[in-house]
Curated annotation (Swiss-Prot):
<protein>
    <recommendedName>
        <fullName>Imidazoleglycerol-phosphate dehydratase</fullName>
        <ecNumber>4.2.1.19</ecNumber>
    </recommendedName>
</protein>
<keyword id="KW-0368">Histidine biosynthesis</keyword>
<dbReference type="InterPro" id="IPR000807">
    <property type="entry name" value="ImidazoleglycerolP_deHydtase"/>
</dbReference>
<dbReference type="GO" id="GO:0004424">
    <property type="term" value="F:imidazoleglycerol-phosphate dehydratase activity"/>
</dbReference>
<dbReference type="InterPro" id="IPR038494">
    <property type="entry name" value="IGPD_sf"/>
</dbReference>
<keyword id="KW-0456">Lyase</keyword>
<comment type="similarity">
    <text>Belongs to the imidazoleglycerol-phosphate dehydratase family.</text>
</comment>
<dbReference type="Pfam" id="PF00475">
    <property type="entry name" value="IGPD"/>
</dbReference>
<dbReference type="GO" id="GO:0000105">
    <property type="term" value="P:L-histidine biosynthetic process"/>
</dbReference>
<comment type="pathway">
    <text>Amino-acid biosynthesis; L-histidine biosynthesis; L-histidine from 5-phospho-alpha-D-ribose 1-diphosphate: step 6/9.</text>
</comment>
<dbReference type="GO" id="GO:0005737">
    <property type="term" value="C:cytoplasm"/>
</dbReference>
<keyword id="KW-0028">Amino-acid biosynthesis</keyword>
<dbReference type="InterPro" id="IPR020568">
    <property type="entry name" value="Ribosomal_Su5_D2-typ_SF"/>
</dbReference>
<dbReference type="InterPro" id="IPR020565">
    <property type="entry name" value="ImidazoleglycerP_deHydtase_CS"/>
</dbReference>
<keyword id="KW-0963">Cytoplasm</keyword>
């Protein structure tokens, strides 16, 4: 069973996250940050990873700790659920078009965190959501999930569309990367013998 259940508590946030890599994309996300919840819904739905996420954060300050810490906890959950990564495809990539926005994602579940995030937003906010938090989330996810993650905006005019295209592109790439490879069912996808 490729599942994980993570609880993380700090002075800034209290988070619980459950994931099932072999799910159907069911989600139950409640962070108190509406736009971020919407993005996380997209991540679950389009990756086919079941995600249940609860976060109580210091939203009286701002959304930063909530968004970043959710990325940390989700990255930890993915790492736990993947185990030794035996039999997975490991790599995933996707071009995601959403109206005016076109985002390319390529990722490697290598155990070596690295983020390249070229997502210039046309404004500092989407409603009340700070667009810089999109990068903060993906940085935390990459670092704590051991993911090499490249995200590039090829075209885009609308901030909401850019953010949503990015989350969906990551979702579709994750879907591909965590998928079991029937031709290499018992193999770790690395010539080093470990990831």
């Amino acid at each position: 069973m490729r599942q994980a259940d993570i609880t993380r508590k700090t002075a800034e946030t209290a988070i619980s996250v459950k994931v099932d890599l072999d799910g159907t994309g069911r989600y139950d996300i409640r962070t108190g940050v509406g736009f971020f919840d919407h993005m996380m819904d997209q991540l679950a739905r389009h990756s086919l990873i079941d995600i249940t996420l609860r976060c109580e954060g210091d939203l009286h300050i701002d959304d930063h700790h909530t968004v970043e810490d959710c990325g940390i906890a989700l990255g930890q959950a993915l790492t736990q659920a993947l185990g030794d990564k035996r039999g997975i495809r490991r790599y995933g990539s996707f071009h995601l078009a959403m109206d005016d926005a076109l985002v390319r994602c390529a990722l490697d579940l290598s155990g070596r965190p690295y983020l390249v995030c070229n997502l210039p937003f046309p404004a500092a906010k989407i409603g009340s959501f700070d667009t810089e938090l999109v990068r903060e989330f993906f940085q935390a996810l990459s670092t704590h999930g051991g993911i090499t993650l490249h995200l590039d905006l090829i075209h885009g005019l609308n901030g909401h569309h850019i953010a949503e295209a990015a989350f969906k592109a990551v979702a579709r790439s994750l879907r591909e990367a965590v998928e079991p490879d029937p031709r290499a069912a018992s193999a770790i996808p690395s010539t080093k013998g470990m990831l």
